[in-house]
């Protein structure tokens, strides 16, 4: 028997409508919620459903419901994931509340969030701006270079969050523009991620920083995903 079940819902509110796919344990009531941004990348290109189902099948892994939130397309990604306050509010309120209503066993507000590239930036932004709802984030090659490393330079005065941060040793490009919005990247992913990790540690957050072999690619993100989620969610649930 499969250890998990995948459902599909639509969440509407604050001017947004997003498809959300839910992956939850079959035999245990979930006590933790993890939002996965960039659902299309994680499900269609990384194979996250099988990887996470293997985690859920282990008794040692905290029973968790994973909510994969659609990004629609690249234009929406560039708008929504650039620390957009309205979209962050939609995730923290409408999406979390809709999932929590379906799983009454979810304990409190110590949720987590996971993303890659721009959605990795959005994941960190969500944790720092909604600390009462989120306890930590997994940020795979997060785009912390965005807007002159704005998030690194504007840390809220709080501590105690969990961050799994990773980046490839080949992510050294700088001085480039990203389509379709022309978003400008002046510093490398590698340098920006390292500086964000250092700042988070200075602010007394618990940080695990990994530099993997490779570039800005799906394959290494997929390879490290189970370990990233296991570390993050176990860290959070052990404190609950």
For the regions a language model picked out, list residue spans one by one.
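Non-catalytic cap/lid and distal C-terminal segments of serine-dependent acyl enzymes
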Residues: 1-240
